[in-house]
Curated annotation (Swiss-Prot):
Gene3D superfamilies: Cytochrome P450 (1.10.630.10). May be involved in the metabolism of insect hormones and in the breakdown of synthetic insecticides. Keywords: Endoplasmic reticulum, Heme, Iron, Membrane, Metal-binding, Microsome, Monooxygenase, Oxidoreductase. Heme binds at C445. It comes from Drosophila melanogaster (Fruit fly). PROSITE patterns: CYTOCHROME_P450. It is a peripheral membrane protein. This is Probable cytochrome P450 6a20. It is found in: Endoplasmic reticulum membrane; Microsome membrane. It is an enzyme of class 1 (oxidoreductase). The lineage of its organism: Eukaryota, Metazoa, Ecdysozoa, Arthropoda, Hexapoda. The gene is Cyp6a20.
């Protein structure tokens, strides 16, 4: 018994020493940081009262002038990280020395949670190989073939908005409708399915997409492992994907693939491209092919990433245009002028002529980036010119997108909505990596062309047909964000008055 007590005391002493050493890492290094709280580190408010992006923004603003180096220290639970405070170092991490920071170090478990092992999450050579295989899928030529599909769904979007406007409704919650639009677009392009989300507000596709983003399989208590020790979580065979979501999407993808292969159906969409890779694998070409689980994971993340990010950006853009009627009028004039020059037809070429619309969308993503931070991990020791700022292998690196987008050094009066910030001459004057809605470098968003295209089409159709205004009592000013979502999204939706023009 005495031996057991001694051993127990020894274990407790060792754990206490280890925890103390771990949470004093940045203090020993002399790197500015906020005092951590065990076991949360600097994330005790995370997903409760403060959003991810706001925590990093606060750290950036509070400590950037207290460091003589390119970053400050940070603890995400037990994981030690740095928050980048120097824009040139952001370029180093994302582009210049990408070979040292090519992984994200986030949770994925290919064996037990196949949908988690997607292009966004996986690391190392597996990521590089998969990225090379998928890149041809997202060329401008391939995007052009998907344009008619987006336009068809766009017609349904106008019908739904028109019904609400014709009914002389008091106000309209727009985020739900534009989410159904992007769900139908991506459901068709990624899965080859007519999801009918716009015609049916309770459509399964939207419900499952929302569940996948907002709900957790294990609850907030397990964030400690999933975020703080993702490799350990995978070894413990944990899963992040909600079971209902996994079952729904795996069945949808399996049924779609089986039907197309058996019936030789071709739709020239994302699914066709994935099926080609699966058939290569099945025929022995493992170097260029993909397994079923691999194509399922890519179809899943393509839907998830494009569904929520694009619809949220559209909602934010409509909110800003309702707030700035002069900008909305100027944008409508451009859209109408371009359409008139193309005989009233919105096509791939006329879309590319709507340059002011692109600036409006860029300024929306600058002011309200849906993905508020980028995460990387040092895959090898990084040696800085000042040894104090060397980064050990395994250290996480946060590039705080929201903070950079609101830094007055790059964007004077950052809280103002000014599309002209994206005039060519102004863009050229800003350093690289000051605009990061899609990331940057080799690991930027592979679907950025598609995402921009569906947002531009949706916005062009809406502004051409409708006027958006604040409702005197239902529109929340200033806009509030949810704190329990990984992405930046509006709290309680966005309510606007919608009338035909």
């Amino acid at each position: 018994m005495a031996v057991m007590i001694v051993l127990l005391i020894g274990v407790i002493t060792f754990v206490a020493w280890y925890v103390h050493q771990h949470f004093n890492y940045w203090k020993r290094r002399g790197i500015p940081h906020d005092e951590p709280k065990i076991p949360y580190g600097n994330t005790s408010e995370l997903m409760k009262t403060v959003h991810f992006a706001d925590i990093f923004k606060r750290t950036y603003n509070k400590l950037r002038n207290k460091t003589d180096g390119p970053f400050v220290g940070f603890y995400m639970y037990f994981k030690r990280m740095v928050v980048v405070t120097d824009i040139d170092f952001a370029k180093t991490v994302l582009i210049r020395e990408f070979d040292k920071f090519h992984d994200r170090g986030v949770f994925h478990n290919e064996r037990d949670d196949p949908l988690s092992a997607n292009l966004v999450n996986i690391d190392g050579q597996k990521w590089k190989t998969l990225r090379q295989k998928l890149t041809p899928t997202f060329t401008s030529g391939k995007m052009k073939t998907m344009f008619p599909t987006i336009l068809t769904v766009g017609d349904e979007l106008i019908r739904v908005f028109g019904e609400t406007a014709s009914a002389d409704s008091d106000s309209m919650e727009i985020t739900n409708v534009v989410a159904r639009f992007t769900a139908d677009v991506i459901g068709s392009c990624a899965f080859g399915l007519d999801c009918h989300s716009l015609s049916d507000p309770k459509a399964k596709f939207v419900q499952m997409g929302t569940t996948a983003i907002t709900e957790r399989r294990h609850g907030k208590s397990m964030d400690l492992l999933l975020f703080g020790a993702p490799e350990l979580a995978a070894k413990l065979r944990m899963k992040a994907t909600v079971q209902e979501v996994e079952d729904f999407y795996m069945n949808i993808i399996r049924d779609t693939v089986d039907y197309r292969v058996k019936n030789n159906v071709k739709r020239h969409d994302f699914v066709d491209m994935l099926i080609e890779m699966k058939l290569k694998f099945d025929n022995g070409d493992k170097e260029n092919g993909l397994t079923f689980n691999e194509i399922a994971a890519q179809a899943f993340i393509f839907f998830l990433a494009g569904f929520e990010t694009s619809s949220t950006t559209m909602g934010f853009a409509l909110y800003e245009l309702a707030c700035h009627q002069d900008i909305q009028d100027k944008l409508r004039t451009e859209i109408n002028t371009v359409l008139k020059q193309h005989n009233g037809k919105l096509d791939y070429d006329s879309m590319r002529e709507m340059t002011y619309l692109e600036k409006v969308i860029d300024e929306t993503m600058r002011k309200r980036p849906v993905v508020g931070h980028l995460i990387r991990v040092a895959t090898q020791h990084y040696q800085h010119t000042n040894p104090k700022y060397n980064i050990e292998k395994g250290t996480g690196v946060i590039v705080p997108t929201l903070a950079i987008h609101h830094d007055p050094e790059f964007y004077p009066e950052p809280e103002k909505f000014i599309p002209e910030r994206f005039d060519e001459d102004q863009v050229q004057q800003r350093p690289a990596c000051t605009f990061l809605p899609f990331g940057d470098g080799p690991r930027n968003c592979i679907g950025l062309r598609f995402g921009r295209m569906q947002v531009i089409v949706g916005m062009a159709l809406l502004i051409h047909n409708f006027k958006f205004e604040f409702h005197p009592t239902k529109t929340v000013v200033p806009l509030e964000y949810r704190t329990d979502d990984f992405l930046l999204s509006s709290k309680g939706g966005i309510h606007l008055k919608v009338t035909r023009v």
